[in-house]
Amino acid sequence: DLLNKPKEIKEKILIGRVEKRLKELSLMDQTFIKDSNLSIEELIKQNISLLGENIKIRRFERFVLGEGLNKRSDDFANEVAQIINAN
């Protein structure tokens, strides 16, 4: 998708892509799951000013969208047939 673009535009696109990826990987730059308008860094700063105490992140858990969900492979027609045959 970058083949026919001028050199200056290619550089800007690549810089944008790298920055976007770094934002996804860095905890402090990620969006807060309960309020997508806040980054984790902004949330921590808000809570520091609210509490008047310093806050340090000691540990965190990483969640991936859809992780841990198992797709069910139920066959509804087969289920109904089994129920009918059982009676």
UniProtKB/Swiss-Prot annotation:
Q: Which GO terms describe its cellular component?
A: chloroplast; mitochondrion
- Protein keywords: Chloroplast, Elongation factor, Plastid, Protein biosynthesis
One molecular function GO term is:
translation elongation factor activity
Q: Which Pfam families match?
A: EF_TS
Grouped into one coarse class, the protein's main location is plastid
Q: Which GO terms describe its biological process?
A: mitochondrial translational elongation
Location relative to the cell = Plastid, Chloroplast
Source organism, top-level taxon: Eukaryota
The record's annotation in InterPro entries points to:
EF-Ts_dimer_sf, Transl_elong_EFTs/EF1B, Transl_elong_EFTs/EF1B_dimer
Which family would the database say this protein is a member of?
Answer: Belongs to the EF-Ts family.
Q: What is the stated purpose of this protein? A: Associates with the EF-Tu.GDP complex and induces the exchange of GDP to GTP. It remains bound to the aminoacyl-tRNA.EF-Tu.GTP complex up to the GTP hydrolysis stage on the ribosome.
Q: What is the protein name given in its UniProt record?
A: Elongation factor Ts, chloroplastic
Species whose genome carries this gene: Antithamnion sp. (Red alga)
Tell me the lineage of the source organism.
Answer: Eukaryota, Rhodophyta, Florideophyceae, Rhodymeniophycidae, Ceramiales
